[in-house]
Amino acid sequence: GEDTLSLHDALPISEMEAFCNLCPCRIIAITGSDGKTTTSTITAELLRAQGYTVHLGGNIGTPLFDRIADIRPDDFAVLELSSFQLHSMHCAPDVAIITNISPNHLDVHPDLEDYVSAKCSIYRGQRPDGVLVLNAKDAHTPRFAAEAPGSVRYFSSIGPVENGVYCSDGVIYRAHGGKAEKLIDVSDIR
């Protein structure tokens, strides 16, 4: 006999998950308790300044699913994703960023662990070539780093990290392989 799939057997997925599954370009997905919108906006603007076409969506900007036919493989999609979107979502962004975790939305999530678990969905589906970017000073970072399917980078506004970007004495550095490279003075950022 033929294998058939009835509508009854289908699993519903959100518009954002459908977008992630069909999007032809690289996806940078951002979540966290605080700083999602700022980080998403700055990420999109930095990519635009480098000449890339960027599609900003999720909790910010306009819905992207209806514009998927206009997205080219060499573009970037920058997505701000909330715990509500991530709770039942399976996504595999090329780069996943978690800004921080603090007790939030506990009126919707039964407890902090459920909230944290929802946030973890941002990286759980990543491929081995995916990158997870974490706040070096967040208490949940060791857990996230241990679970990451791909490589991990860190950021810190209060001192050095081994592999990532940090700010120290008014200067932003990129660290990799035991060496730190000066990127820019904070005072030069406009």
Residue ranges of predicted features:
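Single conserved hydrophobic/aromatic residue that forms the stacking wall/gate
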Residues: G1-D9
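Ubiquitous "structural anchor" signal
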Residues: D9, D66-A69, G178
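Compositionally biased, intrinsically disordered low-complexity segments
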Residues: D9, G125, F144, A175, ...
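Phosphate-binding loop of NTP-binding sites
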Residues: S14-A136, H140-P149, Y166
